[in-house]
């Protein structure tokens, strides 16, 4: 009986002591910025006298995170532990799309939906997959 108590006490002491041992240094998380690689093409013709309202890009909740997504097998998704976007991909892609549409000069103005601007057209987008 005393041997059992000694064994249990030693096991508890070792497990508590192991929690206080210095571990591996924590790896830093690398943050990436989604950027437009090509310069937006400007349109030579006159812009339509219309305003385009751009709705925030819809995406699945799993894609609304800043962590990068990867897939090791078909039908599976996971987040990288040490890599992240600087902001959620759907929000950044909406901003990049608005910049492209403004630079194209097709519309007199391109504004985000809900900005208090009266628009003639509305563009809704959805991010299906991004990994």
Feature map (PLM): residue ranges:
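Surface-exposed short loop/turn segments
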Residues: 20-45, 99, 103-131
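A structural "domain/chain start" motif
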Residues: 20-90
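Short hydrophobic/aromatic-rich motifs at helix boundaries and adjacent loops
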Residues: 6, 65-71, 98-100
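Short, surface-exposed, polar/charged, turn-prone segments marking secondary-structure boundaries
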Residues: 80-85, 98-99, 124
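C-terminal motif of bacterial Sec signal peptides marking the signal peptidase cleavage site
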Residues: 15-18
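Bacterial N-terminal signal peptides that target proteins for export
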Residues: 1-8
């Amino acid at each position: 009986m005393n041997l059992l108590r000694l064994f249990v006490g030693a096991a508890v002491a070792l497990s508590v002591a192991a929690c206080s041992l210095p571990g591996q240094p924590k790896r830093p998380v690398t943050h990436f910025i989604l950027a437009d690689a090509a310069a937006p093409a400007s349109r030579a013709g006159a812009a339509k006298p219309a305003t385009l309202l751009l709705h925030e890009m819809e995406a699945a909740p799993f894609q609304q995170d800043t962590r990068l997504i990867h897939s090791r097998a078909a039908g599976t998704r996971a987040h990288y532990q040490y890599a992240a976007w600087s902001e959620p991909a759907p929000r950044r892609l909406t901003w990049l799309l608005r910049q492209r549409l403004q630079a194209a000069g097709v519309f007199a103005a391109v504004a985000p939906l809900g900005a208090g601007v009266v628009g003639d057209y509305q563009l809704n987008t959805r991010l299906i997959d991004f990994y």
